[in-house]
Amino acid sequence: MRLLAAVVIAVLLWGVGLFAFADRVRAITPAPEPAAADGIVALTGPSAERINAAVRLLEQGKGQRLLVSGVNREVRREELRALTPGSSRLFDCCVDLGFDAEDTMGNAQEIAAWARAKDFDSLIVVTSDYHMPRSLLEIRGMAPEVALTAHAVRTPSLDTANWWRSPADARRMALEYNKYLVVLARETVLGLTGRGEAEPQPEAA
């Protein structure tokens, strides 16, 4: 009986946390105009909108350089440049590509290494709305000395206001929440026991 009660309480707490997480995701878009930072980082995803949003911020002078983290190794620089708005000159001079990251933890390692190599103390982080909480948690774990500003991009295929009404949206939100909890637990343990860091280096422009 006690075990059943514990399970019920755990499920209820998880559900409350899920709704709080989803409300946080809903609230971060539309993204407000960010203050300028030393650099801008974009985490790649299923569409080019994250990169496009980051390039627009670079054009507005919101950062000195832009890192696109997690670029597919088969994608050439010229191909990526052709898919993004703005001038080729700006892309050539001020955009760095990171090819080592294969997941969000890899993005965080890549971003931390880039920020240290450039001696940047502040970054604007560009990624999808539902991906932002976990991304910030990962990056803060790898680069706690760097100030982060979130600039979330809305996911057109995800109704963040009514996600529970769609089985697909509910699955996506629950999966991302579970991933967030795993990272939160890991970062809590690492914060108590120490951390070893791997620092993959992004390609210089």
Regions from the language model: what does each represent?
Residues M1-A31:
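N-terminal type II signal-anchor transmembrane helix
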Residues I9, L158-D159, R172-L175:
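Alpha-helical structural elements
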Residues V11, V16-L18, T127, A174-Y177:
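Generic intrinsically disordered, low-complexity segments enriched for polar/acidic and small residues
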Residues G17, L123, P133, Y180-V183:
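Generic signature of intrinsically disordered, low-complexity segments enriched in small/polar residues
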Residues A22-P167:
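A structural signal for short, hydrophobic/glycine-enriched beta-strand patches
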Residues A117, P202-A205:
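C-terminal luminal/periplasmic domains and tails of membrane-associated envelope-modifying transferases
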Residues S166, A170-G196:
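A transmembrane-helix-recognition feature enriched in membrane-embedded lipid enzymes
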Residues G196-E197, A204:
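A nucleotide-sugar donor-handling region in carbohydrate enzymes
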